[in-house]
């Protein structure tokens, strides 16, 4: 009798293990990887357009552009993954010395299976593109992060919702995020960055700077002499600008509802809840304008 009970317990354990193993094999993450490459020359442009996904742009010293697109879905079978990915169109194409990368889902609001999949499953799309060091980039994403480093070329684009991170760029930058943070450092060229709602961090920019956010803080470190007028503006948040002692500028700061402070010897004014300062620092130079609708404005020594 004791043997029968022990055997029964073992059978239950085996069945339980098989059930759990079978469930895990069905529910495990499914992955699909697509790769392509194109021969290009210096000075071309990457045109990137996708509705969803994170983008990592890397550079190298070869005249080839390499694309790796990885798509992951949790909790689906191979058949379900194949069906869902068949609804996603993508195009990798060379046009002269330029490369076009487009990724887009064909959404059908009347398709019940599509609506269920959108509700129950999470698709992760990661796009990694290796480009020549001397290249230009134009991008548009509906939602997703974009990062790029060590490029000699111009960058422009926007994401509807996502963070933008750019480092060591020799060229102009003109980027926008509808809702996300922007981090830009070590840039030789004019910079225009805008976020609808997010923090903007800038450091080591050697060019004109136009930085704005609808709701968020702006932090900037100016380490080298600017070559043109610059402005930092937030609708709701704090603006903090650090300036090195050998950088000359004509500065003006205004907080409509908040405080305005400067560690440099400038003229300050206060009227009711509005505060401001203005003056010439380190012998003067290009204009630096700082403003906050609701928040504080600070000018500090670096």
Task: Tell what function each PLM region has.
Residues 2-302:
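Intrinsically disordered, low-complexity terminal regions
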């Amino acid at each position: 009798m004791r043997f029968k009970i022990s055997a029964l317990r073992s059978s239950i354990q085996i069945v339980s293990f098989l059930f759990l193993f079978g469930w895990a094999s069905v529910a495990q993450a499914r992955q699909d990887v697509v790769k392509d490459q194109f021969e290009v020359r210096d000075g071309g442009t990457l045109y990137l357009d996708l509705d969803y996904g994170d983008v990592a742009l890397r550079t190298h010293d070869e005249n080839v552009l390499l694309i790796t697109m990885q798509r992951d879905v949790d909790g689906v079978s191979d058949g379900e993954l194949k069906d869902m990915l068949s609804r996603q169109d993508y195009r990798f194409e060379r046009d002269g010395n330029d490369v076009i990368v487009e990724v887009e889902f064909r959404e059908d609001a009347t398709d019940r299976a599509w609506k269920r999949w959108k509700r129950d499953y999470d698709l992760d799309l990661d796009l990694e593109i290796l480009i020549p060091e001397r290249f230009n980039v134009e991008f548009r994403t509906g939602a997703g992060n974009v990062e790029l480093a060590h490029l000699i070329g111009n960058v422009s684009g926007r994401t509807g919702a996502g963070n933008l991170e750019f480092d060591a760029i020799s060229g102009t930058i003109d980027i926008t995020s509808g809702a996300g943070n922007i981090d830009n450092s070590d840039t030789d060229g004019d910079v225009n960055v805008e976020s609808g709602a997010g923090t903007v961090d800038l450091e080591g920019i050697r060019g004109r700077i136009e930085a704005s956010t609808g709701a968020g803080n702006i932090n900037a470190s100016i380490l080298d002499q600017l070559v043109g007028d610059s402005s930092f503006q937030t609708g709701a948040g704090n603006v903090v600008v650090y300036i090195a002692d050998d950088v000359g500028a004509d500065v003006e700061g205004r907080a409509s509802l908040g405080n305005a402070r400067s560690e440099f010897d400038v003229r300050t004014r206060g009227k009711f809840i509005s505060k401001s300062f203005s003056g010439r620092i380190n012998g003067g130079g290009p204009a630096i304008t700082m403003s906050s609708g609701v928040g504080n404005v600070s000018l500090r020594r670096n």
